[in-house]
Amino acid sequence: MLDVVPPTLTPWPFRGRPKADELFSSWFLRAAHAMEIKPYALGHISWRSTPPPLTRDIDGSADEQVLKVMSRATVTPMADCRRTLLSSYETYLFEAHQPLGRTTWVMPLGVRARSRNHPGLQFCPACMADAPYYRRLWRVGWATVCTIHRLRLLDRCSQCAAVVAPFQAPAAFVCHFCLAPFAEGERRPASNEMVEFQRVQESILANGWAQLGESCFPYSVQYFQTLRRVARVLAFGPRSAALRDTVVAQWGGDSQAPASNALRDVEALNSDDRYRLFDLVSRTMRSWPDRFVVAASSARLWRSWAMRDDPMPPFVYADVVSRYLARSI
């Protein structure tokens, strides 16, 4: 990206610091609109790099030089700047961040030049009314609700169904296509079960460790690997429909199949599909591993299917499968 910080760069009139859990892109967006400059124009003035940082997923691809410009321009410590990036989840949510590739749990934006082709950024309409900015958590695959307002997160405009593309909008926090304010988006209540499930995930992410049944995860990455593996066997594969049906019959939920996606990753599902999926995941993983074993056995999800497409499954998951689902027919 940027080779050096421009030596003549002086602080901007905008000196706002990142808000709690704010994404880098959101912080930059607020700066641009506060100074009444189009985001792409401000990006060109600030970075003068090829390719322009804003034509990529800047929350995942911004390097130290990009951060230094923002740090100097807003008089913000570099440590605060780094916390706005998705890479700050490294060793907590995933093992290694991939700046120019797919990272586990990070929802893809499908950026092509200035266009976003995938609903990879979510929002809570009540948060947009109370404290309008985009949170890092809203890019995480298992995040489907706002635990503050107890609402389901949206990944498209409620009026026209366009994806969220902040840099293309003429004003902050409105739809770039129909200009509807995101604060006026549909407010869909989340179930008590899903609010509690997400609170647990957020606590694990913040604390860096987890307990699942009798298994203790000293590093939260190991827990989130297990969570993702259970989500994938519920969402994809020849036995996934039977597994979902079993879970719903035993403990409730919605067995509707998620829309197919070429990536076969839970992060690539839309917000409705992920909400239904993680509702099933939460029901399946209670009383671990008992419910999972009962459901998998009933669905004939034996070891060969449970380990499919994963040469290095999480240890806790692999141990349960090997002990209780060893049949191969």
Residue map of PLM features:
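Basic, alpha-helical nucleic-acid-binding regions used in initiation and control of genome expression
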Residues: 1-329
